[in-house]
Amino acid sequence: MSKLQDRHGGEAAADVGRRARHQRLLLSFPVFPIVLLLLAPCTIFFFTSGDVPLPRIRIEYARRDAPTITAVAADTSPPPPSPPSSSPPPLSFPPPPPPPSSPPPPALPVVDDHSDTQRSLRRLRQLTDSPYTLGPAVTGYDARRAEWLRDHTEFPASVGRGRPRVLMVTGSAPRRCKDPEGDHLLLRALKNKVDYCRVHGFDIFYSNTVLDAEMSGFWTKLPLLRALMLAHPETELLWWVDSDVVFTDMLFEPPWGRYRRHNLVIHGWDGAVYGAKTWLGLNAGSFIIRNCQWSLDLLDAWAPMGPPGPVRDMYGKIFAETLTNRPPYEADDQSALVFLLVTQRHRWGAKVFLENSYNLHGFWADIVDRYEEMRRQWRHPGLGDDRWPLITHFVGCKPCGGDDASYDGERCRRGMDRAFNFADDQILELYGFAHESLDTMAVRRVRNDTGRPLDADNQELGRLLHPTFKARKKKTSRAARPM
């Protein structure tokens, strides 16, 4: 019995040993590499085949409110046949188009904040809406400004006897010019105004920002002037000049004493404004306005006619009915000012000075070809009138370009270059130079100051270089007197 158990037990042990050896042989055989070798081509074919639909991931950037990542089912339709190629197919493909049942929302146009497209997207003020305002009404301004000036004596409203503190205000559009030469012309126009302000001791503020979308175009000046008045109580007078204004008499300065009792000085004629009621009876491209309550009230009465759309269109028709020879196009700031003076003369007329004794506005077409004659006949600036105009205004010329120019662009550019050179010569001559002619940018030496640079033979040049208002008053004391 024990032998039988030993024999069967030995056989069982032998079977166990044989199975263990078989398992070791299986484990030692390279099964996994062979399986990988067989499956790899199948896997590559499976993933690269265009006939197998797979889920895809598409990233959309169309709109801010669209989901950032969207899972889209693959298109089950067969792809269009591709031309044969000797190169192997790429391993990745662009995501398929979205299914027709759920197209992505259209993207909103990306436009400039001040472009015509963006303005068209804004809601225009309707006639049934409340009238436009520049801001909260300002009351008691004169008393508050006087108190501020008393508390800040270091910022007087007068910079000398009979000379008020003047801030010249100008600007241009926020975008680059359509005409490639336009930005250069605007730069020269700014340089011209800076020269004039430096000679006369004026401050200058240049804006290329639309402060309020409803006050665009010609109307941009109104919110700007109001903001500067409130921010600079030390400024007595603000002088607005359009970007196409060129100062051509660098010595002449307005007679400030003449305007002590007036708050608005603008080029015009009483008969043309109050009599003929013509919208061309004054020019709003250059005017001087006092920093006071009256002026703030005028701006508040002026601005509601300026919002684009139905409001401008309505007032344009009203101006055409009220003013002489005024076409019925949309309202402009100049016609609006004439309309206020004509219909509310009792309120505004007494404080408005319509100036025509000198050229606070001079029409360029009548001036630019006479500069050489002015030099020969009058020899030096300081007159300010038609003999030697203070301002040459390029009305109807669009230095920045555009389809609404009234005059030929080449003619305007030639006239502006002549005006800039004519004015610039009055500055260059202070240092002994001048342009070879008004039609060229080349300069030449006209005076040799190397030997006697401090000579003051030319009194007019001395007035420009060293005006009396910039000089300190002489003070004498007993200690300084000779014994």
From Swiss-Prot:
Coiled coil stretches, renumbered: none
EC number: 2.4.-.-
Disulfide-bond pairs as recorded: none
Intracellular or extracellular location(s): Golgi apparatus membrane
Keywords (A to Z) from UniProt: Glycoprotein, Glycosyltransferase, Golgi apparatus, Membrane, Signal-anchor, Transferase, Transmembrane, Transmembrane helix
Topology within the bilayer: Single-pass type II membrane protein
KW ATP-binding (keyword) present: no
Protein name: Probable glycosyltransferase 4
Gene: GT4
